[in-house]
Amino acid sequence: MRRPLSKCGMEPGGGDASLTLHGLQNRSHGKIKLRKRKSTLYFNTQEKSARRRGDLLGENIYLLLFTIALRILNCFLVQTSFVPDEYWQSLEVSHHMVFNYGYLTWEWTERLRSYTYPLIFASIYKILHLLGKDSVQLLIWIPRLAQALLSAVADVRLYSLMKQLENQEVARWVFFCQLCSWFTWYCCTRTLTNTMETVLTIIALFYYPLEGSKSMNSVKYSSLVALAFIIRPTAVILWTPLLFRHFCQEPRKLDLILHHFLPVGFVTLSLSLMIDRIFFGQWTLVQFNFLKFNVLQNWGTFYGSHPWHWYFSQGFPVILGTHLPFFIHGCYLAPKRYRILLVTVLWTLLVYSMLSHKEFRFIYPVLPFCMVFCGYSLTHLKTWKKPALSFLFLSNLFLALYTGLVHQRGTLDVMSHIQKVCYNNPNKSSASIFIMMPCHSTPYYSHVHCPLPMRFLQCPPDLTGKSHYLDEADVFYLNPLNWLHREFHDDASLPTHLITFSILEEEISAFLISSNYKRTAVFFHTHLPEGRIGSHIYVYERKLKGKFNMKMKF
């Protein structure tokens, strides 16, 4: 009676099977070398685990350290001012929150800004204060270093995303384009809400469900988008096409809204409402106020207006710089799955073009999207790749160093002089400062950290709709000499120090002589003076016998 064979793929019975088994049994008495093979499943799992460890401890950890080091260097090589908001809507507010003195601009009395972003730096200030380390230099540099670290994380996230979507070569060139972009270098360490919006946008894109992405997470990306909206409500413009695409492609639309978007939006908005309730003292939805003022009512025109095509003819080409031809080339080469990124760029430019007031920084968040196409272009260059890389690097290096170290540096350098007036002046108790420049030209108490009496020309907009409205700065520049004689009609009200641009000296020289002011310091500002802005900043000091009188008007 034949015993049944085990279930190993052979049929029971049959001569061939019996002979095969008999042959195997005979050979078992000799030395047989069996080849050991690991299962494909085991091999793939082990390979992925090793790759994951490499990404964490090998390539990516070194990449992160390199990027952090570069952005820290970036931070210290940007010593110029860009726009007033990098101080007046962040650091000045944070300083006022922690140290209870300073100045809040009209946007805060009108509740157009959220305290969420300044709270980040206020927390840093509070920790430094509790540790007794709140020196003026730390108050200036620690927030900027914090912003630099966040920008470094965003840079690495962009690299990781492109590595998932394409391959390491494409990711490398996108990363190169991102790091050598002069405008990114110029902005990414500044304490601007636009910078934070850009950082959050890049990290959110890492979790966004792009075709080919392995890091999709609706909760994470929607949380980051919601935070970007809380910090800068116009982030909704950039994210509208991306959110719409996700909604259209999601098969479980109701689940996406009820279990992802609504809970995330509710939690984030509630947190923002509570933060603003604490600091404003009343419930207010600043995001609605901001959009109503800047988008619906278009009050931003008070600070200047531009033609509708400005972003296409000037703004976008300038921030792209020498990346522009590579961006155009990459748009033709990139696969269809990147079409949504191009649509987002064009949509953002079109919507912002409808608003009269335009600035370069408003479209900064679309710049990383453009780097994807620039990197794709470099990947496919063969003959001209080395010259193209040299051209990109050197041209952007020049622009980055010039704008970061030279152009518009005087308004920061003069604050160092004011620090000396406060900390090194034996008569500091009687010192006072009057900044006679276009409003918000310089930082304020966040860069002095001393309750020194200071004043500047103010420029709040008229919200009542008056025609031919002139703010204090406008009235001053109509006739500076008459304004000074009228404002400081007696010696008791004169400040000890005047700060002004060089173009004003000749016009007010009679006042300076009659009031016994002497020029004591000169600071270079720009090679491109225009309008009310001069090439240099002058500091005048009034030196009289006896004690100074501090009855300066505020």
From Swiss-Prot:
GO molecular function annotations of the record: alpha-1,2-mannosyltransferase activity; glycolipid mannosyltransferase activity
Effect of R232H: In DEE80; no effect on protein levels; decreased cell surface presence of GPI-anchored proteins
Protein's UniProt name: GPI alpha-1,2-mannosyltransferase 3
Organism: Homo sapiens (Human)
Stored InterPro entries: GPI_mannosylTrfase (IPR005599)
Known outcome of mutating D155H: In DEE80; uncertain significance
Outcome, altering R71Q: In DEE80; strongly decreased protein levels; slightly decreased cell surface presence of GPI-anchored proteins
TM ranges: 63-83, 136-156, 192-212, 224-244, 255-275, 315-335, 340-360, 362-382, 387-407
UniProt function note: Alpha-1,2-mannosyltransferase that catalyzes the transfer of the third mannose, via an alpha-1,2 bond, from a dolichol-phosphate-mannose (Dol-P-Man) to an alpha-D-Man-(1->6)-2-PEtn-alpha-D-Man-(1->4)-alpha-D-GlcN-(1->6)-(1-radyl,2-acyl-sn-glycero-3-phospho)-2-acyl-inositol intermediate to generate an alpha-D-Man-(1->2)-alpha-D-Man-(1->6)-2-PEtn-alpha-D-Man-(1->4)-alpha-D-GlcN-(1->6)-(1-radyl,2-acyl-sn-glycero-3-phospho)-2-acyl-inositol (also termed H6) and participates in the nineth step of the glycosylphosphatidylinositol-anchor biosynthesis.
Compartmental location: Endoplasmic reticulum membrane
Gene name as annotated: PIGB
